[in-house]
């Protein structure tokens, strides 16, 4: 049995442990939905699944608290399925194996799922508790947040009654988030007719791995390497100098994760193999030098593979490579009025080329709607010039901060009373569901907070143990001090 069961507060960690025993990668919500629904009904609470697949559980106010504003406790049930290249794990079937490393809880070779499993676990602890004081509560556990916030988008007006929403999906304890970035998925596609490799050519598969990856919003400001952007530098030079031709490319697998790995199959004249291998080694050394202060050692390797039946036609190949090379990636602009806060960014997240089809997916973020439009139009122009069809989907506005929020003032006072310091009040460069839910329920007073997590969306994801108690104690105190209606 996992040692996390011995951690405090036990009522939170026991529920988180239960969540690690239920496969819940984005897109596969059946088991976790059934589990949460059974949990709520087992407590004798009104529990149901709405049309969008969200689980909603209602808990009445405790005696004497009926005159308090209703609170919606919100988290998402899915987790990002990322694993190390050498880890054997089927996220649809296998359980998450946790372990304790000093003050951190980690998973063995996979994402931990603390994003947002610890938020869900805290909600479960509150629903189960019989000794807490609180007003009317509604738990809203949304589906498929990580792949497009589909549960939040599908929420119908009138489903919930609360006036305050506490989103438990932030990742730095001691910080209260009052605003977030909006986003847009940009997808460029192209179909082509493959051509046969030249006679006498050989095929080489190059693989780039070992990058840190991470959350494409929270960690985009750190300048971490993007596997697709590194690989295109090599491929472009191989085409220009060694007559290489592109047969296929696979890089990244999640729209909101900085790609950690990418590989491509290229064909070259046999006599250029030695020079190509030299370029691989040169690029490996160069990338490690450029990112020595940021990345763990980057691995770039090459191996002979069977010659593919087809490859990308030369003109289309050159246009694709130029577009990938030119594509904006990383921070575009900081918020001028908020120090050290990213306003606008993009993540060249997923590239799939081969078999007569090319698809490139980018997630653009901005807390400014006008800058989001500027960035997405720039990306559209970049890939349109390469002859690709570009679609914009999944767009959502940011959450505009309200510094006069009643729940913000109450929580700031409560935090200082509990811990002796003021909490930091921030805007986050990530797509919290608050923006979407707030548009569906106008006037909702919202705050996002949570325990400290690091490297979410990557196998390095970890949760800082002492902050989980502080987070839960603060949540309980907030519920006890909910403003009057």
Q: Where are the regions that the model predicts?
A:
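Active-site metal-coordination/substrate-binding segment of hydrolases
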Residues: 65-163, 189, 203, 325-342, ...
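Acidic/His- and Gly-rich active-site-bordering loop/insert found
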Residues: 3-103
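His/Asp/Glu-rich mid-to-C-terminal helical/loop segments that flank catalytic regions of hydrolases
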Residues: 158, 224-241, 270-273, 318-325, ...
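Acidic, glycine-rich active-site loops and adjacent beta-strand->loop/helix elements
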Residues: 77-79, 140-148, 170-173, 212, ...
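Substrate-recognition/cap regions that form aromatic- and gly/pro-loop-enriched pockets
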Residues: 341-430
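Midchain, well-structured core segments that form catalytic/ion-binding scaffolds
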Residues: 23, 103-106, 146-147, 153-365
């Amino acid at each position: 049995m996992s040692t996390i069961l011995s951690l405090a507060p036990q009522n939170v960690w026991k529920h988180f442990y239960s969540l690690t025993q239920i496969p819940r990668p984005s897109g596969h919500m059946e088991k976790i939905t059934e589990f949460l629904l059974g949990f709520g009904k087992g407590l004798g609470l009104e529990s149901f699944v709405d049309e969008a697949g969200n689980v909603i559980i209602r808990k009445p106010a405790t005696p004497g608290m009926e005159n308090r504003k209703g609170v919606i406790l919100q988290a998402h049930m899915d987790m990002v399925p990322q694993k190390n290249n050498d880890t054997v794990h089927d996220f649809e079937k296998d359980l998450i194996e946790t372990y304790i490393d000093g003050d951190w809880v980690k998973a063995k070779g996979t994402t931990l799922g603390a994003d947002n499993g610890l938020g869900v676990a805290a909600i479960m602890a509150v629903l189960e508790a019989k000794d807490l004081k609180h007003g009317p509560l509604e738990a809203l556990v949304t589906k498929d947040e990580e792949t497009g916030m589909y549960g939040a988008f599908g929420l119908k007006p009138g489903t919930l009654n609360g006036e305050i929403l506490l989103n438990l999906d932030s990742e730095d304890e001691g910080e209260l988030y009052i605003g977030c970035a909006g986003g847009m998925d940009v997808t460029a596609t192209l179909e082509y007719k493959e051509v046969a490799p030249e006679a006498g050519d050989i095929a080489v598969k190059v693989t780039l791995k070992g990058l840190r990856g991470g959350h494409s919003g929270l960690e985009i400001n750190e300048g971490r390497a993007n596997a697709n952007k590194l690989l295109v530098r090599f491929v472009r030079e191989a085409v220009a100098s060694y007559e290489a031709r592109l047969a296929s490319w696979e890089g990244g697998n999640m729209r909101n994760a900085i790609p950690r790995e990418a590989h491509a199959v290229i064909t070259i004249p046999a006599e250029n193999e030695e020079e190509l291998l030299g370029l691989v080694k040169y690029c490996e050394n160069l990338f490690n030098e450029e990112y020595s202060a940021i990345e763990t050692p980057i691995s770039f390797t090459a191996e002979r593979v069977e010659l593919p039946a087809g490859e990308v036609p030369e003109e289309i190949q050159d246009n694709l490579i130029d577009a990938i090379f030119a594509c904006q990636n990383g921070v575009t602009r900081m918020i001028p009025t908020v120090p050290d806060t990213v306003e606008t960014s993009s993540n060249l997240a997923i590239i799939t080329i081969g078999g007569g089809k090319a698809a490139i997916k980018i997630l653009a973020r901005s807390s400014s709607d006008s800058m989001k439009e500027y960035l997405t139009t720039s990306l559209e122009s970049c890939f349109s010039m390469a002859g690709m069809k570009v679609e914009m989907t999944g767009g959502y506005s940011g959450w505009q901060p309200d510094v006069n929020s009643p729940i913000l003032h109450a929580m700031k006072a409560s935090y200082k009373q509990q811990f002796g310091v003021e909490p930091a009040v921030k805007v986050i460069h990530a797509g919290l569901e608050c923006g979407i839910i707030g548009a569906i329920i106008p006037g909702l007073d919202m705050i996002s907070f949570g325990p400290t997590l690091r490297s979410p969306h990557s196998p390095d994801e970890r949760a800082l143990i002492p902050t989980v108690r502080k987070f839960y104690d603060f949540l309980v105190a907030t519920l006890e001090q909910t403003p009057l209606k």
